[in-house]
A protein has these predicted regions:
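Domain-level signature for soluble enzymes in the chorismate/prephenate branch of the shikimate pathway
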Residues: 1-386
């Protein structure tokens, strides 16, 4: 058979090489775990920027001898380095907080296949051996599951680079007793998903969660005759299209999610903003400690006075202590017209001396303040070779 079809023979060779690459990547990750254990004993920082840069430069030099492009080598190994860093961070956090890595029940929005489900699966893969799924219809249900002990963790989207803040989640954070214990960022690639053979001219109804509709509004404006139907999650939309088995309906969602429902990709959609990412946060009943060997982020919720310059005064406290704020979001205080709460993400460990001084000063000048959580930052900024 292979002698009659040389393409098949070549593909078999490529598949065999791919299997070897997977085995080597798994072996490399095991070594990264051992490196993490060594850093735990020697109390060294997880990230070693100089080592990462030297590694990339060496690999680029070696790659030239094999006619491999420097950009290709850099992109490939930046991803491998990121995996190594996050694997070591998870190891240090498990050790510090005595987390049982065996299993966890994680609540997320929607049935299987939603972006929240994919994010929960990604988080679980790095932190637990077994992931017990708990899909929910609404954000409030997710919070309730963890608050009442029905689930161990909640994974919820908090912001998107195209459509902005997820306001429903910010509003729930005002009143919850849960703490943020982790974060992750997911690349969002929307597709128009269908249950069988059809084309764009045949579609008349599209189902999805409001967020994908916002993020893909430029594409959707090309088809003004399409009826837009909102669902509680992208996976609920996919489920509806799979059950309908109609050439006239489609869902906006992920290709990975569509596969779970037997749907095909009719069109890959470019979102309004080309780089479309959603940041998710992980919530638990108990706050965690973050190792000083790991880059940390602290999220605060505060209400300032209504006098002029009150917010500026609070932000100056951060500047005076050399604390970097990476996000500021405001939300109305329900029941108090024209008053707002502010959410701040600060690039610092809650236990650091400067952060503690800043919290003391903020407590004196704000009407109220609450630490929503301190957690490892999973934003691994890639190192570029010189």
């Amino acid at each position: 058979m292979t002698s009659e079809n040389p393409l098949l023979a070549l593909r078999e060779k490529i598949s065999a090489l791919d299997e070897k690459l997977l085995a080597l990547l798994a072996e490399r990750r095991e070594l990264a775990v051992e490196v993490g254990k060594a850093k735990l004993l020697s109390h060294r920082q997880v990230r070693d920027i100089d080592r990462e840069r030297d590694l990339l430069e060496r690999l680029i030099t070696l790659g030239k001898a094999h006619h491999l492009d420097a950009h290709y080598i850099t992109r490939l190994f930046q991803l491998i380095i990121e995996d190594s860093v996050l694997t070591q961070q998870a190891l240090l956090q498990q050790h510090l907080n005595k987390i049982n890595p065996h299993s966890a029940r994680i609540a997320f929005l929607g049935p299987k296949g939603s972006y929240s489900h994919l994010a929960a699966r990604q988080y679980a893969a790095r932190h637990f051996e077994q992931f017990i799924e708990s899909g929910c219809a609404k954000f409030a249900d997710i919070f309730n599951q963890v608050e009442t002990g029905q689930a161990d963790y909640a994974v919820v989207p908090i912001e998107n680079t195209s459509s902005g803040a997820i306001n429903d989640v910010y509003d729930l954070l005002q009143h919850t007793c849960l703490s943020i214990v982790g974060e992750m960022t997911l690349t969002i690639d929307h597709c128009l998903l269908v249950s069988g053979t059809t084309d764009l001219s045949t579609i008349n109804t599209v189902y999805s969660h409001p967020q994908p509709f916002q993020q893909c509004s430029k594409f959707l404006n090309r088809y003004p005759h399409w009826k837009i139907e909102y669902t509680e999650s992208t996976s609920a939309a996919m489920e509806k299209v799979a059950q309908a088995k109609s050439p006239h309906v489609a869902a906006l969602g992920s290709e990975a999610g569509g596969t779970l429902y037997g749907l095909q990709v009719l069109e890959r959609i470019e979102a309004n903003q080309r780089q479309n990412f959603t940041r998710f946060v992980v919530l638990a009943r108990k706050a965690i400690n973050v190792s000083d060997q790991v880059p940390a982020k602290t999220t605060l919720l505060m209400a300032t006075g209504q006098q002029a310059g009150a917010l500026v005064e609070a932000l100056l406290v951060l500047r005076n202590h050399n604390l970097i704020m990476t996000r500021l979001e405001s939300r109305p205080i329900h029941g108090n017209p024209w008053e707002e709460m502010f959410y701040l993400d600060i690039q610092a460990n809650l236990e650091s001396a400067e952060m503690q001084k800043a919290l003391k000063e903020l407590g004196e000048i704000t009407r109220s303040m609450k630490v929503l959580g301190c957690y490892p930052s999973e934003n691994v900024v890639p190192v570029d070779p010189t």
